[in-house]
Each structure stands twice: as structure tokens, then as C-alpha cells.
């Protein structure tokens, strides 16, 4: 029996992990999980899966759970996330499906106790990729990607020599506004942005997909996950989201990973790596039904957030933290109807260009530095826009 420690059980990825557990109850058990603010869904999960440990973000929610399920160990807050990541159980696998920079610390906690991490939390590598991969190597643990694009690359590289790779190509659906002009973006709404053409995802990542910051994050993730220089990482628009990534080798061969747009497939592959065992959860790919696949260039003029992400990783050090914190706050403000869609780009660019952060750009990158800058960026933006 494999016992899962699931960070972010009530979100989009977490819910799909639970689908996998339901399909294979003889293989997996949910030993511990965390959740954000969906207390009712968390209570349902406890009722169904009977975990040992539950972490709430809010103390009041933790108290309610303890009153309802007195035999369950309950914790809360950031320290609670670390407890979930290090929970003592049989054959543990830690799945990080959190959203935002809050995912970094529990990832490091899991690594430090020698646990492989199954990673859906993009921000872990965006802001702390250098530290995370170094710690993983030091502790001889694996970071297995759950993101569909990185899962595809992970599969395509398996059994191949990384030194023979000319480049990897990450595909992008283009998001909710891929067919709109810059002028048309002036008038789009939150509801428009949340209507993704291909994927069923959480609200934050759906907005990131619309701005193309999601793809920028994926470039940074790939840089760290596969230890490739940025010049070997490229991108292309592929509206159908059938090809999830490609790998081109120096002999001219190009390998592509294809599947339907269902996150349960990369989740399943990550947890069962390197197996491709049978499942009824995912609809088989029917290429005749798909008919045609289309590819287009991704313009940095049309999608400047992609350029900002490339700028941040090229500058290195604390700049990816600035990028991520500014984006998290800006997306939050947009979802609260406090700013317009194009203001997200404006806020991120202002943060990257703000000279107040220059004093943090020298010296070693550390967790305290990341956390300090993350907090400062958030304060600066919220002071101006709230």
C-alpha cells in the first residue's frame, strides 16, 4: 500500500488525485492532506478517505474539523503544511498541488526527510528552483513533474541522452484570449478569462494561461527540472493541446508526446512512473476525430508576460521571486475585480523595473531572502492598488 501526503486536496489537481485513489484503492491510501478555504469539501474528503492528518490554512477550520472528527490529527498554517509533507507513514509519496509561493517550504521539508516530491506547484521551482534541485541532489530524491508539459518532456527524455538534445519545445494553447487583439483585451472580463478552451483548471492558473505567464513559468521550471540552458528551451502555440511537448535531437529527430487534455494522465504517470498501466479514467486519443493539428508562433509583442518571465530567469537571483510575487498579487486583484486584465502585465513589469529591489540582487539566494522579497513585493503592490 502506497500512502499519499497531498498538499492542496480541494483544488483542481488535488481533486483529480483523489479520482486516481478512488480508481486504485487497493494501491493508494490518503494518509494526510491540506486544504485552503473549502472546509465543506475537506470534511467530505475526511469522511470518504479517513486520513491520519489534516492541515487547514485557518485555525478556526482546524477546530471545526477536530470537533467533527476527534480521532483525526489536525494542524493548521504553514507549519501544518510542513507536517503534511513529512508525515510518518508507509511508502509515502508527497504530492504538492498547492497554488503559489506557499508551496516552496513544504517541498523543501519533504526533500530534507528523503522523500520524492510529485510536483504540480509551479512556484516551487520558479522562485526556488536552484535551491530545490540542489537539495534534491544532496538528499538523493526525485522531483517528478505533474504539469502536463513537463510530464511530456520527462517521458520523452526517458532512455535518451540529455547531451543529444538540441532543444525542448513546450506547447501553449494560447489561453482564453488567444484569438483576441491587444485592443480587444482592454474590455475583457474575469468571466471571459476563466473560460479556458481546452483545460479544466483552477482560477489562478487559468488567468496565468490567459496572460501567458503560465507558459513563462513553465520555461523556468523546465530550466531547473531538466538542467537545460534557456537557449535550449523554446515554445510554440498549439491550439488543440494534443501535443503536450516535443524534444528535438541533434540528428533532426523530433519526439512528441500526445494525449487528450486530461490532467489525470500526468498525475497517474508521475505516481506510477515508469509504468503506463491501464486506466478507464482518461478518454483515449482519437486522431481521426481530432483531424488537424495547428501550430503558430507565439509573439512576445502579443504576450509580453512571456518576455517578462524570460527576463527574470536571465537576470536570475531574486528576479524570479519578484516576477512570481507581483503576478500572484496582480492576478488576485483581477479576480477581485479591482484591476483590469491588462493591468496584470503592467503591475508585473513595474515590479521587475522597481529599483527598490536592486539591493537584494547580489549575494547568495537563500530562503530568508526569497521570503523577505516576496513579502516586500506584495506590500508595495497592495499599498498602491488597494
Language-model features: locations:
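Catalytic, metal-anchored helix/loop core of enzyme active sites in primary metabolism
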Residues: 1-386
Amino acid at each position: 500500500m502506497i500512502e499519499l501526503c497531498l498538499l492542496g486536496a480541494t483544488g483542481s489537481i488535488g481533486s483529480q488525485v483523489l479520482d486516481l485513489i478512488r480508481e486504485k484503492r487497493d494501491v493508494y491510501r490518503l494518509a494526510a492532506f491540506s486544504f485552503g478555504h473549502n472546509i465543506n469539501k475537506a470534511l467530505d474528503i475526511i469522511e470518504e478517505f479517513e486520513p491520519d492528518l489534516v492541515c487547514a490554512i485557518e485555525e478556526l477550520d482546524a477546530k471545526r474539523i477536530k470537533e467533527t472528527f476527534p480521532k483525526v490529527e489536525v494542524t493548521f498554517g504553514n507549519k501544518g503544511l510542513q507536517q503534511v509533507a513529512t508525515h510518518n507513514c508507509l511508502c509515502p509519496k508527497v504530492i504538492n498541488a498547492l497554488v503559489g509561493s506557499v508551496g516552496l517550504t513544504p517541498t523543501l521539508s519533504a526533500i530534507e526527510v528523503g522523500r520524492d516530491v510529485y510536483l504540480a506547484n509551479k512556484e516551487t521551482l520558479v522562485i526556488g528552483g536552484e535551491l530545490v534541485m540542489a537539495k534534491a541532489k544532496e538528499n538523493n530524491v526525485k522531483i517528478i513533474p505533474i504539469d502536463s508539459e513537463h510530464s511530456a518532456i520527462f517521458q520523452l527524455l526517458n532512455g535518451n541522452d540529455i547531451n543529444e538534445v538540441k532543444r525542448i519545445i513546450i506547447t501553449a494553447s494560447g489561453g482564453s484570449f488567444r484569438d483576441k487583439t491587444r485592443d480587444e483585451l482592454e474590455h475583457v472580463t474575469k468571466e471571459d478569462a476563466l473560460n479556458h478552451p481546452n483545460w479544466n483548471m483552477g482560477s489562478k492558473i487559468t488567468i496565468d494561461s490567459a496572460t501567458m505567464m503560465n507558459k513563462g513559468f513553465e520555461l523556468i521550471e523546465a530550466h531547473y527540472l531538466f538542467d537545460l540552458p534557456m537557449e535550449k528551451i523554446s515554445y510554440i502555440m498549439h491550439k488543440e493541446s494534443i501535443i503536450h511537448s516535443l524534444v528535438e535531437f541533434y540528428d533532426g529527430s523530433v519526439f512528441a508526446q500526445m494525449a487528450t487534455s486530461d490532467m489525470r494522465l500526468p498525475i497517474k504517470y508521475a505516481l506510477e512512473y515508469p509504468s503506463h498501466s491501464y486506466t478507464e479514467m482518461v478518454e483515449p486519443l482519437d486522431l481521426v476525430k481530432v483531424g488537424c493539428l495547428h501550430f503558430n508562433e507565439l509573439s512576445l509583442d502579443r504576450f509580453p508576460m512571456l518576455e517578462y518571465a524570460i527576463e527574470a530567469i536571465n537576470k536570475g537571483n531574486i528576479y524570479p521571486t519578484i516576477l512570481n510575487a507581483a503576478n500572484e498579487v496582480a492576478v488576485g486583484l483581477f479576480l477581485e475585480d479591482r484591476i483590469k486584465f491588462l493591468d496584470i502585465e503592467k503591475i508585473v513589469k513595474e515590479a521587475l523595473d522597481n529599483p527598490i529591489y536592486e539591493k537584494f540582487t547580489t549575494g547568495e539566494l537563500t530562503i530568508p531572502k526569497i521570503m523577505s522579497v516576496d513579502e516586500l513585493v506584495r506590500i508595495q503592490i497592495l499599498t498602491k492598488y488597494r
